[in-house]
Amino acid sequence: MSPSPRPSDADGYRSLPALPPVTVFLTVRDEERHLTAAVEQVLAQDYAGELEVVVAVGPSRDRTREIADELAARDARVRVVDNPTGRTPAGLNIAIRAARHDVLVRVDGHSEIDASYVAAAVETLLATGAANVGGLMVPVGTTPFEEAVARAMSSSIGIGSASFHTGGAAGPAPTVYLGVFRRDALERVDGYDEHFVRAQDWELNHRLREAGEVVWFDPRLAVTYRPRGDVRALARQFFRSGQWRRQVMRHHPETAGLRYLTPPAAVVGIVGGAALAVVGATAGPTWLVAAAAVPAAYVVGVVAASAVVGRDLRPAARVRLPLVVATMHVAWGSGFLRGVARKVGRSARDLPRQGHTAVLYPDPATSSPDARPAPGEGRDHRLPAED
């Protein structure tokens, strides 16, 4: 797939030859509520080329497997493969190996994409010659708390200035949401590193760029994301994201940057200031005020920034925004400081891939409910969970 001349912003993306066949791939576990909608929106894509869907299914406690098999039985474009470990990066690699085509489109089991998503992404991939093209994660909430999370996740005060969160002009980017890949580029870097239970997208895009490839952000490629619905779930998500972002930094020290070190530094300042305030309470008001300065400044800053960013939210969401922002910061920073107990040694791409043989369903000769992994079987419980 050779690069085409890059179009100007004024002209837009030029007309291209017949679109190539694509494989849309996803990995799921315990997704019975959303899987049918996720697959059907892919099958309904307004795409002129050939399209198939590969679903890697992990050990589930619900009807995810049965629903996937029913979808495959109804439409020959859908194939189901087994992901014995249930881990996201392993499932993605299994789906990629099972794919028949050279353009690979990743979606999530609970994401929502527009009918033109695949066509627009493939056109951009061809026009730019990039290894990976992705767009904007658009969080959409329905409750006041979810609306506050959505606003925090799409603003720089909540999650930083990454273009796939906050938007921006089309162009090269460090990473993008999900992704539409050239298969040859993925194979050259050996796909997803299966050590990284989370942050595997960022880590993969880093290796692509290190290999001289281009990761391209296109704001037209919007993907709807449903945010966490309560403080506990949000804190758990961001704590684990912080853990795994530190793991990426340990494995790739060159990726260290101020953006990733600010939240843990803030946590240290808040906790240290609070501890000194307790001690200072016995030493007199001067020590107490000095020790409380950092935590107080942080609280004032979060409240002030939230008032600006959330000024057009409905009141119930607006009053929750400072709590949401603080939860994101403190949980992510704490996770980063905690890290992952198990150190990454060799990359998974250097290790033999055990238990990753693609098993296609339905297959009357080999498939039976008894032969499939039980829920949780094959998972490495020494690593933090993904959610």
Regions inferred by a protein language model and the residue ranges of each:
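Cell-envelope/extracellular polymer assembly enzymes that use nucleotide-activated donors
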Residues: 20-23, 52, 203
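Short, acidic, metal-binding catalytic loop of nucleotide-sugar glycosyltransferases
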Residues: 40-50
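A conserved acidic beta->alpha catalytic loop
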Residues: 57-66, 85, 108-114
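Glycine-rich, basic loop-to-helix element that forms the pyrophosphate-binding segment
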Residues: 82-99, 120, 176
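Short aromatic/hydrophobic "clamp" motif used to bind/position activated sugar donors
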Residues: 104
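Conserved donor NDP-sugar-binding/catalytic core segment of glycosyltransferases
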Residues: 115-147, 151, 222, 226
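Catalytic donor/gating beta->alpha subdomain of glycosyltransferases that bind UDP-sugars
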Residues: 193-256
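Membrane-embedded multi-pass helical conduit in multi-pass membrane proteins
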Residues: 266-345
